[in-house]
Amino acid sequence: AIGFDGLNDPDIVAR
């Protein structure tokens, strides 16, 4: 899943 900063999903954290 795609989670920006872990908001949606803690899989991919993009800051």
Swiss-Prot record:
What does the entry give for GO biological process?
chitin catabolic process; defense response; polysaccharide catabolic process
Q: Which compartment or compartments is the protein found in?
A: Secreted, Cell wall
Q: Name one GO molecular function term.
A: endochitinase activity
What is the E.C. number? 3.2.1.14
Classify the source by domain of life: Eukaryota
Tell me what reaction this enzyme catalyses. Random endo-hydrolysis of N-acetyl-beta-D-glucosaminide (1->4)-beta-linkages in chitin and chitodextrins
Gene Ontology CC: one annotated term: extracellular region
Q: What is its main location?
A: secreted
Q: Which keywords are on file for this protein?
A: Carbohydrate metabolism, Cell wall, Chitin degradation, Glycosidase, Hydrolase, Plant defense, Polysaccharide degradation, Secreted
Q: Which family does it belong to?
A: Belongs to the glycosyl hydrolase 19 family. Chitinase class I subfamily.
What role does this protein play? Defense against chitin-containing fungal pathogens.
Protein name per UniProt: Endochitinase 1
Q: Per the UniProt entry, what species is this protein from, by scientific name? A: Taxus baccata
Species classification = Eukaryota, Viridiplantae, Streptophyta, Embryophyta, Tracheophyta
